[in-house]
């Protein structure tokens, strides 16, 4: 197959865009070259996110800048960046990601050090690197880089991970370095995401149960220690357990979020009609945008949004299974990791806004306002599209090779 034919063509003539078959994969491997359902789901979430950011951010934007569309305009600019990132990522072969995963890990590690030295501080946290008018939250890049590194490591040291502790604890040492640098910002939420992804991948790779449970126990103990040693983290935990004990202090944000859900009822107050976003609910367009969705679109709206997010995560897990079956371990582990990442971050964000988990400062994938998060999530989603594209090409080549052999025998 010629190189130009191997490129991912999202609008190729072989694609049938009939709506009844949009979420149904055809059995014939040559009928389509990418996962239309996954792409449609991701684009739907991104477009929906833009609408909700515009709705949730207008009161605060008006108060801070005098322009109610300030955050919406910035969010649109971020989406332009997403389009550029998608175009670039879709053209990179998966073998390149595997080849340069250690280099990517090193570059992001250097950026994490740079954040501590020359980073920009906001609300007491130093998490951003300023590049001209753009501020990059390097911890988001760390999720991306570490996920790719872990997938590559599991392929290179697969047998070693299963047979001895040395192979198991090497990536844990790398994780510990990343975790230390990120905790210095401080950003415990990102560390938890990295830890869960690491544990999940090591389990899928067949690590010994003794090492696996020792890692989980160590992680839980470290998390408890980090919470107990920092008063502000302890306040978050105690306030989430009973926010009504101090509704105008440590429990204020959560109580306002719960009020938003209560007002939403089954069908919501209608798009744009949220009361809590009128500067009652802090971070209404970022970490707590799901509460605004609940208030404006109701229980039905949040079920639909969660269903689409779950679909994306499960599609990634399914893709991982398919890749493992055809002996593409790097692509399989990476798809697994991205699915775990999307699912866990969604659970933490939603859990924090409904009072089931302490606040961690994690965004709702594809929906919350924030350039770095959007860009990284888009890159991860496009990697899934690229993985599936290469898998389908392999299937096409296998079928064509079989036909050639059958013709020769005939």
Curated annotation (Swiss-Prot):
PROSITE patterns: FTSW_RODA_SPOVE (PS00428)
Ranges per topology, Cytoplasmic: 1-37, 91-99, 155-163, 208, 313-336, 386-410
Keywords recorded for this protein, A-Z: Cell cycle, Cell division, Cell inner membrane, Cell membrane, Cell shape, Cell wall biogenesis/degradation, Glycosyltransferase, Membrane, Peptidoglycan synthesis, Transferase, Transmembrane, Transmembrane helix
A UniProt-annotated Pfam family: FTSW_RODA_SPOVE
GO cellular component: cell division site; plasma membrane
Main location: membrane
Catalytic activity: [GlcNAc-(1->4)-Mur2Ac(oyl-L-Ala-gamma-D-Glu-L-Lys-D-Ala-D-Ala)](n)-di-trans,octa-cis-undecaprenyl diphosphate + beta-D-GlcNAc-(1->4)-Mur2Ac(oyl-L-Ala-gamma-D-Glu-L-Lys-D-Ala-D-Ala)-di-trans,octa-cis-undecaprenyl diphosphate = [GlcNAc-(1->4)-Mur2Ac(oyl-L-Ala-gamma-D-Glu-L-Lys-D-Ala-D-Ala)](n+1)-di-trans,octa-cis-undecaprenyl diphosphate + di-trans,octa-cis-undecaprenyl diphosphate + H(+)
Highest taxon of the lineage: Bacteria
Transmembrane segments: 38-58, 70-90, 100-120, 132-154, 164-184, 187-207, 209-229, 292-312, 337-357, 365-385
Pathway(s) annotated for this protein in UniProt: Cell wall biogenesis; peptidoglycan biosynthesis
Residue ranges annotated as Periplasmic topological domain: 59-69, 121-131, 185-186, 230-291, 358-364
Single GO biological process annotation from the record: peptidoglycan biosynthetic process
Reported function: Peptidoglycan polymerase that is essential for cell division.
Record-linked NCBIfam families: ftsW (TIGR02614), PRK10774.1 (NF008042)
The protein's name in its UniProt record: Probable peptidoglycan glycosyltransferase FtsW
Taxonomic source organism: Shewanella sediminis (strain HAW-EB3)
Lineage: Bacteria, Pseudomonadati, Pseudomonadota, Gammaproteobacteria, Alteromonadales
């Amino acid at each position: 197959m010629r190189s130009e034919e191997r490129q991912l063509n999202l609008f190729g003539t072989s694609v049938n865009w009939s709506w009844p078959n949009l979420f149904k994969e055809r059995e014939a491997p040559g009928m389509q070259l990418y996962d239309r359902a996954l792409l449609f789901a991701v684009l739907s979430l991104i477009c929906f996110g833009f609408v909700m950011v515009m709705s949730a951010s207008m009161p605060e934007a008006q108060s801070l800048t005098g322009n109610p569309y300030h955050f919406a305009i910035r969010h649109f600019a971020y989406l332009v960046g997403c389009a550029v990132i998608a175009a670039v990522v879709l053209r990179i072969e998966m073998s390149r990601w595997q080849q340069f995963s250690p280099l990517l890990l090193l570059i992001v590690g250097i950026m994490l050090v740079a954040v501590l030295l020359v980073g920009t501080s906001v609300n007491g946290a130093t998490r951003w690197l300023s590049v001209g008018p753009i501020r990059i939250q390097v911890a988001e890049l760390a999720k991306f880089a570490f996920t790719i590194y872990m997938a590559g490591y599991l392929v290179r040291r697969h047998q070693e991970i299963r047979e001895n502790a040395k192979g198991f604890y090497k990536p844990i040492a790398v994780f510990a370095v990343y975790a230390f640098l990120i905790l210095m910002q401080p950003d415990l939420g990102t560390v938890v995401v990295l830890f869960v992804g690491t544990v999940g991948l090591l389990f899928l790779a067949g690590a010994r149960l003794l090492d696996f449970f020792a890692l989980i126990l160590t992680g839980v103990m470290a998390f408890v220690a980090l919470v107990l040693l920092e008063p502000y983290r302890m306040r978050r935990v105690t306030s989430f357990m009973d926010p009504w004990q101090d509704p105008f202090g440590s429990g204020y944000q959560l109580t306002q979020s719960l009020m938003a859900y209560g007002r939403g009822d089954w069908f919501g107050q209608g798009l744009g009609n949220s009361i809590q976003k009128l500067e009652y609910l802090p971070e209404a367009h970022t970490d707590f945008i799901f509460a605004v969705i609940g208030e404006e679109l109701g229980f039905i709206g949040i079920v639909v949004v969660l269903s689409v997010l779950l679909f994306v995560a499960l599609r990634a897990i399914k893709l991982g299974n398919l890749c493992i079956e055809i002996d593409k371990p790097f692509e399989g582990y990476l798809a697994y990791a991205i699915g775990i990442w999307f699912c866990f971050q969604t659970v933490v964000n939603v859990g924090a806004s409904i009072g089931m988990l302490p606040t961690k400062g994690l965004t709702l994938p594809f929906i919350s306002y924030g350039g770095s998060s959007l860009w990284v999530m888009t890159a991860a989603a496009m990697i899934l599209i690229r993985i599936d594209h290469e898998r389908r090409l392999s299937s096409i080549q296998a079928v064509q090779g079989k036909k050639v052999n059958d013709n020769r025998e005939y």
